[in-house]
Amino acid sequence: MFAPLLKKLFGSKNEREVKRMLKTVQIVNAFEEQMVALSDEQLRAKTEEFKARIAKGETLDQLLPEAFAVAREAGKRVMGMRHFDVQLIGGMTLHEGQIAEMRTGEGKTLVGTLAVYLNALSGKGVHVVTVNDYLARRDANWMRPLYEFLGLTVGIVTPFQPPEEKRAAYAADITYGTNNEYGFDYLRDNMAFSMDDKFQRELNFAVIDEVDSILIDEARTPLIISGQAEDSSKLYTEINRLIPKLEQHIEEVEGEVTKPGHFTVDEKTRQVELNEAGHQFIEEMLTEVGLLAEGESLYSAHNLGLLTHVYAGLRAHKLFNRNVEYIVQDGQVLLVDEHTGRTMPGRRLSEGLHQAIEAKENLNIQAESQTLASTTFQNYFRLYNKLSGMTGTADTEAFEFHQIYTLAVMVIPPNKPLARKDFNDLVYLTAEEKYAAIVTDIKACLAENRPVLVGTATIETSEHMSRLLNNEGIEHKVLNAKFHEKEAEIIAQAGRPGALTIATNMAGRGTDILLGGNWEVEVANLEDPTPEQIAQIKADWQKRHQQVIEAGGLHVIASERHESRRIDNQLRGRAGRQGDTGSSRFYLSLEDSLMRIFASDRVKNFMKALGMQSGEAIEHRMVTNAIEKAQRKVEGRNFDIRKQLLEFDDVANEQRKVIYHMRNSLLAAENIGDTIADFREEVLNSLVSQHIPPQSLPEQWNVAGLEAALNTDFAVKMPIQQWLDEDDNLHEDSLREKIMAQLLVAYNEKEDQASAEALRSFEKQILLRVVDDLWKDHLSTMDHLRHGIHLRGYAQKNPKQEYKRESFTLFQELLDSIKRDTIRVLSHVQVRREDPEEEEARLRREAEELASRMQFEHAPAPGLDQPLADEEGGEVPVAVVSEPIRNDQKLGRNELCWCGSGKKFKHCHGQIN
């Protein structure tokens, strides 16, 4: 009730923050005259002066006004660009660990230099994060002269970079790279077998460009390093032949079945579900082709892998469409980023879905993979001591940034007021009418020599628009987002008079559309341009620039609404940069995905009430509000999914931290002999307690079992029964001491055969390998647990609590297994003296062999596969990402062993040999 009044009196929180920062801006401005008077050498010397002051205890906050003044003056001298006052506010926002929302064309890259320079003075390193390699190289090379003028070093990390080069890039004061590369290097560092093989320092400060794209859009997408698993391509081919025989079950809204079938498709949650008839039909077909034994159920434990293949095939056929979710190029399935429209070479869907799509398209089916290490961007970026970001559109996601990352969003005032005109949406009955109206709008703009940008949601739509324009004889350029460099060049010239560009979603393009085109690109394309040529190019550009402004600026046409308002705002933001004129219009139809799934009924009834005819459009605020409500509904659902996924991944993340801390401690340790001794004692205590229960009578002791277990785990035969017969005073504790003494004698003999130094090195290598092997299996087990945990909701149990409880038990078993398996390997192995150089060469060969088998996946979560029950036991759809289940009958670590011993598989044939 009083909120509007209080806001009127005191201003919004954002306005109050801007006022606070303006006071600091005045202090920065006061330093300007002093900085102008300095020579280049004196200005550069300021960097060393600041470092010395930090060493004496001065904080970065205290240095900020003077450091910003130095960076601003350096920008003027090196790049001919002076930071505006609002850009100084943006730099302060980044330094304070917040997200700066700045409109297109407000100079985000230049703003970043302020916070980057200030924080690089600490000597702990700054990571600048971009969405693709092209932007990382472009921004690093663009800003390198500024940083080097100030005495700072700049590095760029790229895929397939030589290790020494990458290590040097991370050691630089400022490092540029992509979110993927930073994440993969973090995982690689935690698979290293030597401290010298690691790349990254402590994660200090990161500035994320297009922060919404990385922390929101890709939050559900895990980074996975995997190795190849068994080949099951024949199974995918067989399943692919059966899927087309299944019929979709379709119902009317009232519940009347219009087409009975075998499975249902839910477009909202992107799920497919076999019904009873479908289960029966697919079981019959699988039995016919010999994939399922006669009388067996698809839901038997050993057939769950087959069931996963069936669902993968169904989803490949019914939820993934060519030229929408993926394209086929050079015999490969390339995924298309739904947010940017770019193809994503190298990324693969998990759970066998990618192989199912390859089978559907009759392509060569690539082998499945097993996860070796994984993390999510949500958990990786939360490891930084301080995190900040920049984007043109973050305010709509401010709640999620705060909830997940504790990041506040600060809307930075524009340097010039917005002059763009945003027209109301036009809604048509059919897509055909909508496209016809778009073509008419394009013709009208081109008649006035206005540049036009048409944004589409899919490659399929952009190609359809291109065909329509070709039929009309209208010249245009199409961007299907395959080559970043070419793409940036086309976008740079999309503001020329009469230019028509069709592009998939414009998120993360990183290139401004300048009215009249980009004269700097023209100059760059000339070999050794003369001053006269440059002057002529500038003069020509000035004429074109004025011509476009007089025509009304860039006109942005959107062929449909995206699920996220933020993506729509990014497309709109292409027009009207830095106070330029421009306009935007969204064209919709009731056949669009968003309208059909979420908003069509209300709008359709409204249009019928108006008695609309074919070809007519409705332009009304009520319609726009209905669409925005639908978008908010989708955004809310997607936020719930990401939050739910994070809550589950947080459990794995805590375990990941423990394992990675253990590995780092091992790598840093010179001698782990004490650790191995502790392991030996714990394993022995466990064995003795298992066979000689505390407070038990000698008649209850399983002496034969203890002798066998000691032989299995320690490779030592001990006549325990004989000792007991010979010494009546032997009790549990004294027996344990006698066994330990014998074990130490046997182990010391190994040390004599090699050397203490060689054995210590061998112990470290074995422990690291055991940790990695068991962690890999643990990841698989955790994924499978998460995959089925939603079923606990039907038993009135909280799936999250159940998942936490069971994962804790699994993790405790993992730690016990690490100790036992390490001791077992060290006890059984025969050691010999090895030349240090020979050992180093062998380890290097093994590391290279492992690296050659690794695959780096940033595979989008495969839709909303299994519903996870919420706190009340209802179902919340969640994207589940797990290791693809293979056709071989793989036993879980906690299942009974296949040999019939009655032991768990992990305690029998599942142990490390």
Swiss-Prot record:
Q: How is the cofactor bound?
A: May bind 1 zinc ion per subunit.
Recorded catalytic reaction(s): these are: ATP + H2O + cellular proteinSide 1 = ADP + phosphate + cellular proteinSide 2
E.C. number: 7.4.2.8
Q: Where does Zn(2+) bind?
A: C897, C899, C908, H909
Specify the enzyme's EC class, one word: translocase
Q: Which GO terms describe its cellular component?
A: cell envelope Sec protein transport complex; cytosol; plasma membrane
Q: What does this protein do?
A: Part of the Sec protein translocase complex. Interacts with the SecYEG preprotein conducting channel. Has a central role in coupling the hydrolysis of ATP to the transfer of proteins into and across the cell membrane, serving both as a receptor for the preprotein-SecB complex and as an ATP-driven molecular motor driving the stepwise translocation of polypeptide chains across the membrane.
Q: Which NCBIfam families match?
A: PRK12904.1, secA
- Assembly information from the UniProt record: Monomer and homodimer. Part of the essential Sec protein translocation apparatus which comprises SecA, SecYEG and auxiliary proteins SecDF-YajC and YidC.
> Which HAMAP family did the record assign?
SecA
> What is the name of the protein in this document?
Protein translocase subunit SecA
Gene (name only): secA
